[in-house]
């Protein structure tokens, strides 16, 4: 399927005819294509094998991805928070990436207490359609789960994180969270937001809640439900010892090996890039994720991508996404539903010789590297890619298709 984020960038919305001659009853059979005849430009289409050596830097990203499997879903806290917030749900491997969501001044607290890994999830009661949230215009929630070396480090970090953030404004007032005497929280009575931290074992749960009005009771209730929902999930997580971070595998089920890399023969290593680090805690930061394979739960928490069940797992390289379904039947069903939403006015030429594909124009800034996008199906896999021009994305998509075929 095409992700909501991909749809937002590509602006898709009506119908396109089926391009390949697949069997209509039972298991679809991929059409045979002469791969050597495809125009792949300079893009490689030979499968790669994941490197067997890693390091602590990449391992922190991979451990953060693992933490995504025990994150709460914002709808567990507030059933209205059904929409994702673009680029606000992601692994947080470093204090820098976490500070991008919290506040730059909090970074020192995370560093001094040895933050190891983390994950963030966000939700909204309004479909923001790729736009940044506006405080007061909707209900919003961001929850961070941060891992520290031990219980003491987590307790000290939770206290310092709250104190540092609260000190940014003299109008901040301490708040108590019922049922959690060890929690730290604050808010400004004239602003409809509240921030809170709570240490549980070697983890810190950080919550940033926003409402449509400065209602302390509503906000404290939201924070309390965050802790209620998140704490039980932590018992299911078995943390990797920090000294073993570099042993975590760089790929899962060959997913990254099947996703077109940014350069021929260049493995995309796990990376998270934070932009627009905010002085104050808020919703202006953006996190871009590269070279990771998300597990089933983290995949479904990435609501801004709009993944559709019965998706299993996804590989992500920023705007390029590879999705795996249980079988070819379910993959085709989701793919067809997505392309039935395509607006014919947005269509551009698809790569010659590639079956089951459609391409569209992108509504983006002329300086953006994402000027066109394609969505292609092969077997139980679908891939969505972007490019800096129609010709570029057509070649990339042809290479992606060939890579999927050759990967089996």
Predicted features along the sequence, with ranges:
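Bacterial N-terminal signal peptides that target proteins for export
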Residues: 1-10
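C-terminal motif of bacterial Sec signal peptides marking the signal peptidase cleavage site
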Residues: 18-21
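N-terminal "mature-domain start" segment
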Residues: 23-133, 220, 226-227, 231-315, ...
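Hydrophobic, ordered structural segments
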Residues: 26, 146-149, 161-162, 195-249
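Short, intrinsically disordered low-complexity segments
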Residues: 40-42, 67-94, 183, 187-204, ...
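Short Gly/Thr-rich strand-loop-strand
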Residues: 92-113, 123, 137-140, 150-197, ...
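A short acidic-to-branched-hydrophobic micro-motif
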Residues: 117-156, 302-337
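Long compositionally biased, domain-poor regions of proteins
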Residues: 193-199, 203-208, 212-213, 293-407
